[in-house]
Amino acid sequence: MPPMTKAEGKQDKKAQQYGVTPQSVDFNDWYNEVVKKADLADNSPVAGAMVVKPYGTALWENIQRWLDDRFKATGHESLIFPTLIPMNFITKEADHVEGFAPELFTVDRIGTEQLTEPYVLRPTSETIIGYMWSGWLNSYRDLPFLHYQWGSVFRAELRTKAFLRTSEFYWHEGHTAHASEEEARREVRQILDLYHEFCRDILALPVVRGEKTASERFAGAVATYSIEGMMRDGKALQSGTSHYLGQNFSKAFDVKFQTREQREEYAYTTSWAISSRIIGAIIMTHGDDFGLIMPPRIAPIQVVVIPVSRKENFDQMVAEGEKLAHELRAQGLRVKVDRREGVTNGFKYNDWELKGVPVRIELGPRDLEQGVVVVKNRNAEEKETLPREEAIRGMANRLDSIHNWLLQRATDFLLTHTVPADSYEELKNAIEHGNWVRAFHCGNAECEAQIKEDTKATTRNIPLDDAEFFNEREEGVCVKCGQPSAYGKRVIFGRQY
């Protein structure tokens, strides 16, 4: 991973007191410990599957709520499809079955009775949705279909990592059908831009919007677009995808309609998704050596109030803490009062730091007498003593400032650790030092595969012309073979999760 800054390095010794391995010592251990000790998730007795605990579930529910509201606001409708999909559906689209075959969970018996037609646990739902659409669609008047569902999907993973790679994971999957290619492609971009907005404005995650190379496309897609985020170890995380499927699935499942001109035509379809992997992105983009730092706009708890007192007046201080919390909740904030007894204040401070709650307020008897509170931002070293009313009045702005700080820090890291390369040696050296690389590429799949074999890096995407980062158009020759660039701009290479 890229070297830590001097300021971050100074935290290592102090961080050990919290029981979290510093990122600079072992990023993988740091991640696993934070997931467990921050009470986000735990291992389960089912190989490759996790249990998402209440704190992690609350985070996922906030993610669902924001996205669900936006989907509905843009005319999309939710529905529910079966988890079991007939195996013969998967085999109908050749590229689709080839892409998913190694990952399928198969159900071939009920009790001791062998099934004549096996099922699979859904890896994604394009096939069964296409089958149902074929019975629902008759005329252009029925279009567009703007559908999505929330649920879990199943893809066998040998090397699992909580939230990032599990054999069962959680997501929404959107599926739409349109009367024209233009309309379908517009849908693909609308969703990609919505994902970008969500990451930037809600999660404080800077992401690169771009199109995947042919080798990295979704199985059966004509074009795949992604948002790519850089984690604190320099690896990429594909944080969301939007696919233009053309007529591939509609032809496989006979999804056709009568046009205005009374012709029969196959529908143009799309699919798109953000999964629970986005929680991994939050952890690995914003976390530090003391644990999580929750983006304030999505945090399950935005402010924690800690009554500070001796045992004899603890109940009184808890009551005062609840009054303070009530005033903050009146602003629409998510607030918790730590009512735990028999636990030291120091333990509580460390615990909420680990959980990444954006703002901590300490309230003791002397503070109460003086009409002040002690406030500490999760991203700050020092505490502030403020008049009670001032702290309450300024809380929304304080949370916004933390969001902006997180976004700027992550953006600076992305820009610092993304470098151009004009020779193969430069590319290999930059990748080895934990960077993303911007380089020209010929578009040849064999050339791309050789780069992956040599460096363990893949093409992340080809940034769009209106992408926030790295969108410059320029010509050059492939960094590997010297042939002319296929894309008129540099492609992003990086190791990935």
UniProtKB/Swiss-Prot annotation:
Its main location: cytoplasm. InterPro entries: aa-tRNA-synt_IIb, aa-tRNA-synth_II, aa-tRNA-synth_II/BPL/LPL, Anticodon-bd, Anticodon-bd_dom_sf, Pro-tRNA-ligase_IIa, Pro-tRNA-ligase_IIa_arc-type, Pro-tRNA_ligase_II_C. One of its GO terms (biological process) is prolyl-tRNA aminoacylation. Gene3D superfamilies: Anticodon-binding domain, Bira Bifunctional Protein, Domain 2, C-terminal domain of ProRS. Keywords: Aminoacyl-tRNA synthetase, ATP-binding, Cytoplasm, Ligase, Nucleotide-binding, Protein biosynthesis. Its EC number is 6.1.1.15. PANTHER family: BIFUNCTIONAL GLUTAMATE_PROLINE--TRNA LIGASE, PROLYL-TRNA SYNTHETASE. The keyword Phosphoprotein does not apply. SUPFAM superfamilies: C-terminal domain of ProRS, Class II aaRS ABD-related, Class II aaRS and biotin synthetases. Belongs to the class-II aminoacyl-tRNA synthetase family. ProS type 3 subfamily. It is found in: Cytoplasm. Homodimer. This is Proline--tRNA ligase. It catalyses: tRNA(Pro) + L-proline + ATP = L-prolyl-tRNA(Pro) + AMP + diphosphate. It holds the Pfam family ProRS-C_1. GO terms for molecular function: ATP binding; proline-tRNA ligase activity. Catalyzes the attachment of proline to tRNA(Pro) in a two-step reaction: proline is first activated by ATP to form Pro-AMP and then transferred to the acceptor end of tRNA(Pro). Consists of three domains: the N-terminal catalytic domain, the anticodon-binding domain and the C-terminal extension. It comes from Deinococcus geothermalis (strain DSM 11300 / CIP 105573 / AG-3a).
